[in-house]
Swiss-Prot record:
Entry EC number(s): 1.14.11.-
Binding site for 2-oxoglutarate: Y165, R197, I198, S199, R203
Domain of life of the organism encoding this protein: Eukaryota
Extent of the transit peptide: 1-20
Keyword Iron: yes
Name of the protein in question: Alpha-ketoglutarate-dependent dioxygenase alkB homolog 7, mitochondrial
GO MF terms, alphabetically ordered: dioxygenase activity; metal ion binding
Organism: Homo sapiens
Bound cofactor: record note: Binds 1 Fe(2+) ion per subunit.
Length: 221
């Protein structure tokens, strides 16, 4: 599927960051699975990386996630940020979340080693609400979404360093999503070599949960 390159459907002029199995899935997920390349400047990427590195370095990479969805990762929940990083996260909130959406107070930070990957999964509604938005740092990767009932319906997102991806509604609950391992990391016929990848993920509040509450974080991408 990912390596054939038989179908590369563009939603933006110039290089494509989204491709899918056909026009219907692209139309269906046009506003539900969004990539904004170049959302971060190089300086902003470095700001986030510098702030996260000391905390991540204290943790070991793990190979058995609590629900077996992630391989080769370390993660943390972070609620205290520098002023510069808070300004970046406020931009994410403005770009991805509606005025009526409340965000979880903690931001999920997921660090995948170069050989790490995220297996296909559907997020649990217990842990976050209808929208997640993730910043990608360090390495490009390919996120694949596959319809849970119609596996022939799929979408792939090219997530370059500095990009922002947004998953809403149907893209999260009707489609599984994954981050491809290095040996499978193609976007059409284009090889996307994987390295270490950090994602900084903001999440809307689950329905019925108060802003100060939290639970086991989801295996978010």
């Amino acid at each position: 599927m990912a390596g054939t390159g038989l179908l590369a459907l563009r939603t933006l002029p110039g290089p494509s960051w989204v491709r899918g199995s056909g026009p219907s899935v692209l139309s269906r997920l046009q506003d539900a699975a969004v990539v904004r390349p170049g959302f971060l400047s190089t300086a902003e990427e470095e700001t986030l990386s510098r702030e996260l590195e000391p905390e991540l370095r204290r943790r070991r990479y793990e190979y058995d996630h609590w629900d077996a969805a992630i391989h080769g990762f370390r993660e943390t929940e972070k609620s205290r940020w520098s002023e510069a990083s808070r300004a970046i996260l406020q931009r994410v909130q403005a770009a991805a979340f509606g005025p009526g959406q409340t965000l979880l107070s903690s931001v999920h930070v997921l660090d995948l080693e170069a050989r790490g990957y995220i297996k296909p999964h559907v997020d649990s509604i217990k842990f976050c609400g209808a929208t997640i938005a993730g910043l990608s740092l360090l390495s490009p990767s390919v996120m694949r979404l596959v319809h849970t009932q119609e596996p022939g319906e799929w979408l792939e997102l090219l997530l370059e360093p500095g990009s922002l991806y947004i998953l809403r509604g149907s893209a999260r609950y009707d489609f599984s999503h994954e981050i491809l391992r290095d040996e499978e990391s193609f976007f059409g016929e284009r090889r996307i070599p994987r390295g270490r990848r950090i994602s900084v993920i903001c999440r809307s509040l689950p329905e019925g949960m108060g802003p100060g509450e939290s639970g086991q974080p989801p295996p978010a991408c």
